[in-house]
């Protein structure tokens, strides 16, 4: 099992905390965000971790090498003009190595805090594409937002499969959980993921975004539509997202 952390972001809403550090190195309750992710992944038995940086790449690179001996470091030089999917594909070489070595691959956002227990549940899923879903999302969202519906996204599950995610909801009935930014590709499925990416129309719009700025949820939705759903790895809290300075006051 390998993992790739997408850590190219600037984190403008966390300024001035991100003036001298990338977003993933902001401190939360005594540790940097990326510390929690690496410790959770390693604690669940992930054998190899790669990181894609962007903003203040050399700061992140130095920290990864000195604190965690992580050498698989990739750079999204266009981090300020692209989004998550492009950041992930900056590590295409790493994705292809998972295919060659028959290693499943966990993809993690870099601004979330989660436990090894959540990673273990994801590892245990046997689906080609598995997505962690928080069924108790409203507990966290009500701490973060005056109106949770405004920031939440749709997520629909049927018979253990995620069929839709990432759209703007009209009501709470359209939200059966929240995507937290943590998912897994099986090594059998990764070639199809790369083929699907290569087949996408570079001139098209994806949920209102151009190809280079496509949301990860739009990409995952495309895979779901093409290949028939994704396994829902259901959790009940136990994680948090750090997007605003106020999030730093919330306990996971």
Where are each of the predicted segments found?
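Conserved alpha/beta core of the MobA/IspD/sugar-nucleotide pyrophosphorylase nucleotidyltransferase superfamily
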Residues: 1, 158, 172-252
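Short beta-strand/turn micro-motifs composed of small residues
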Residues: 7, 53, 109, 133
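N-terminal nucleotide-binding beta1-loop-alpha1 segment
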Residues: 1-19
């Amino acid at each position: 099992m390998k993992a790739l952390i997408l850590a190219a972001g600037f984190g403008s809403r966390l300024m001035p905390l991100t003036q001298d550090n990338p977003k993933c190195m902001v401190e939360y309750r005594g540790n940097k965000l990326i510390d929690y992710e690496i410790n959770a992944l390693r604690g669940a038995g992930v054998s190899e971790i790669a990181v894609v940086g962007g903003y203040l790449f050399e700061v992140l690179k130095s920290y990864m090498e000195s604190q965690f001996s992580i050498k698989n470091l990739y750079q999204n030089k266009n981090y300020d003009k692209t989004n998550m999917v492009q950041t992930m594909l900056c590590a295409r070489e790493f994705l292809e190595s998972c295919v060659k070595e028959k290693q499943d691959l966990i993809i993690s956002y870099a601004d979330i805090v989660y436990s090894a227990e959540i990673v273990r549940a994801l590892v245990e899923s046997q689906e080609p594409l598995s997505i962690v879903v928080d069924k108790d999302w409203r507990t966290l969202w009500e701490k973060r937002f005056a109106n949770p519906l405004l920031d939440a996204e749709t997520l629909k599950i049927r018979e253990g499969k995620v069929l839709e995610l990432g759209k703007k909801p009209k009501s709470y009935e359209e939200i059966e959980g929240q995507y937290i930014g943590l998912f897994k590709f099986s090594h059998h499925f990764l070639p199809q993921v790369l083929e699907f990416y290569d087949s996408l129309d570079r001139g098209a719009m994806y949920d209102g975004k151009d190809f280079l700025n496509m949301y990860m949820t739009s990409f995952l939705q495309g895979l779901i539509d093409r290949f028939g759903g994704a396994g829902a790895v259901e959790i009940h809290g136990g994680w948090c997202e750090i997007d605003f300075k106020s999030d730093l006051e919330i306990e996971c």
